[in-house]
Structures are given as structure tokens and as C-alpha cells.
Amino acid sequence: MEVSARVRVLMQHALHTIERRYKQVLLLIQQLSQHGIQSYSISPFHIHCIYSCYSL
């Protein structure tokens, strides 16, 4: 099945958006853990798993 150029561009844009969000969330978690706030059940590993699913 041929994927049109438009769809490819849209998918790339979506991936870039997800990538940016992912980095923002990782940064936030790093900042929070520096302040000793670790009551979050979401670890960088969980986020990595979610991110990996999106980037398939």
C-alpha cells in the first residue's frame, strides 16, 4: 500500500510533537526528583514504554 506524501508529513509532524512532549515530561520528572518529590507512579521507564508504542 502506497502511503501518500501528505500522510507521511502528517505522521512525521505527529511524531515530532510526541517527541517534544516526551522530552518536556522527562525534564519535569528530573526536576521534581531533584526536589525530592518522588511520589509519582510514572517513572521515566513507563514514559519510555508509552513513547515506544507511539513511535512504532
UniProtKB/Swiss-Prot annotation:
Protein's job: Part of the gene cluster B that mediates the biosynthesis of botcinic acid and its botcinin derivatives, acetate-derived polyketides that contribute to virulence when combined with the sesquiterpene botrydial. Botcinic acid and its derivatives have been shown to induce chlorosis and necrosis during host plant infection, but also have antifungal activities. Two polyketide synthases, BOA6 and BOA9, are involved in the biosynthesis of botcinins.
Organism: Botryotinia fuckeliana (strain B05.10)
Domain of life: Eukaryota
Keywords (A to Z) from UniProt: Virulence
Pathway, per record: Polyketide biosynthesis
Name of the protein: Botcinic acid biosynthesis cluster B protein 14
